[in-house]
Amino acid sequence: MTKNLFHYLTLCVLALSLVACGSDDDGSNPTPTVTNANRNIVTANVPKEITRLEFPHLRGGDNIVIVHKTDNNTKINYSVEWDYGKKSPRWSCFPMTNGSSKGGVGRNGPFEEDPDLPSSMRFSDTNSMFTGSGYDRGHMCASYDRQYSKEANHQTFYYTNMQPQRNAFNAGSNYDGLWVQMENFVQNRAKSLKDGDTIYVCKGGTIDSESMILERIKGQLIVPKYFFMALLEKNANGYKALAFWTEHLNHTVPNAHLADYAITIDALEEKTGIDFFCNLPDDTEDKVEKSLSLISWAL
């Protein structure tokens, strides 16, 4: 009796195993596949941080990526793609949280050469290029984007984070320049974030087409004709994106209506040739980059 019961139980287990195997193979509950065809790939020649969400797709060629960190090289500050053929930054990218602009450390200059950029890849004296040019040293990652730490703030004064800007466009005579108003928007937005939420920012000026270059200081240092900001906000509800695009103006815009300069990330990519937020899954990237809700950004 015991032997027959053993054989019966064995047959039941075998039958259940066959049914289970059949269920696994029938495709009724497949594992979802996340595609990310245009993501940055880490190689021996680039830093591992290029897979972070604030990074655009790297251009390659005569370009290097410099990542600046603080707190004994443990905390991301900002990153730059530097075109050493043009001796110009293409963009600076960085995260903003509700603590980024808090702390009140002020401006911790002076402006100086980036210690992480080989001297062969830059002008021998970038300061002299700006001096007497009539252009401001325009921050991409702003000094007031980094008020939580003197070390982080000081790094924003590296010339790799600067592009020439007209004063009326940059700060203006009474902080009424368009650029500083866009910066204020990002800073105020970040301050309102909940803990754990982040705005991923990429900012720069156009350097890749002669039609988008205003002039060259001393025939060398590129002055962009247009400037941009690409913003990706991540919170408990998911992602949303916004871009600003503007001509390099020669006048102030008091109380600017920033919605007039807002476009989709897709539109910004068309204008710049830069693939922003490439490390998002493709379906998420496609959705957020073609969408623009001014109301959700309080514009």
Q: How does the language model describe each region?
A:
Residues 10-13, 145:
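A ubiquitous, low-specificity "background" feature that marks scattered single residues
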Residues 1-9:
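Bacterial N-terminal signal peptides that target proteins for export
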Residues 22-299:
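Domain-level detector for secreted/extracellular nuclease and nuclease-toxin modules, and
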Residues 14-15, 159:
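Residue-level signal for mature regions of secreted extracellular proteins and peptides
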Residues 17-20:
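C-terminal motif of bacterial Sec signal peptides marking the signal peptidase cleavage site
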